[in-house]
Amino acid sequence: MFLNNKVDYLLNLSQFKDLDLANVFQDEPLHYVDIGARGGVHDLVTPFASNVSVLGFEPDEKECSRLINMKEVVDQWANFALEPIGLYNSKGIRKLYLHSVDTNHSLLPANSKFVNRYSMEKFKVIGDTPVEVDLLDNIYDAKFMNSGPFAEFVKIDTQGTEYEILQGAKKVLQKDSVALVIEVSFFELYEGQKLFCDIEQLLRKNDFAFFGFSSKLHTRSCKFLDKQNEITRERVMQADAVFFRDPVTSEKTSTKRQNQSIFIISLTNNFIFKNFVSSIIRYGHLKNIG
């Protein structure tokens, strides 16, 4: 089954329509949380869009208002909501550091050592502004505790504070979450940020297994060499890391709903973890997903 990121591509495939699972998420959509929603919802789940309920978090209130008023952003989803707040491991007011390009804004300032070393003009700090932050667990307790499944699939891309957000989401991660896509860094692009190894260890302690990267590795170099004349490799900077709660190795028994979510997420967009699905079916964990 080959997938692309067109809206509802998966739902419209004849092979998928023949599955008992095809109608499961119509009554109760897959709950997807997009943390760092500037620019719109990531296309990770667009092949399943009309059966996905989206909750986005973005501390820039103007950007939230812009997105909410864009029909093409909102209408493709079963439900769509945005929270104009930043997430962290504590509640309060923090500085949002503004960088040359708005997609690089962060609760951490860019690390000048690497900005200068790799001539990263788009990461230069140009100012700051106060933003409200809170724990995802607090927001869940206050607004979503009685609303059914929550954060079954989570994407975090917040330019350096992914680790702290996970620290503030321990309750949520243990409730319904089965898959995570986390932007990770391999050197300290932002001052004091945690790296891939730290995030992997934290999630492993919370019963999530690292499966691979959902996109290409982003690299940086000092640009001293002409790539047309020299064969060279660049330093890996960032990537989107994929984590699953693996029913085969997890100490926690998966619910039928979680198994169904794993099946769908494993096939969406550029994941296509077919071997993962095949293995857990073989081990008997997805016998009754329909």
Locate the predicted segments by residue.
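Phosphate/nucleotide-binding beta-alpha loop and adjacent structural elements of enzyme active sites
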Residues: 1-290
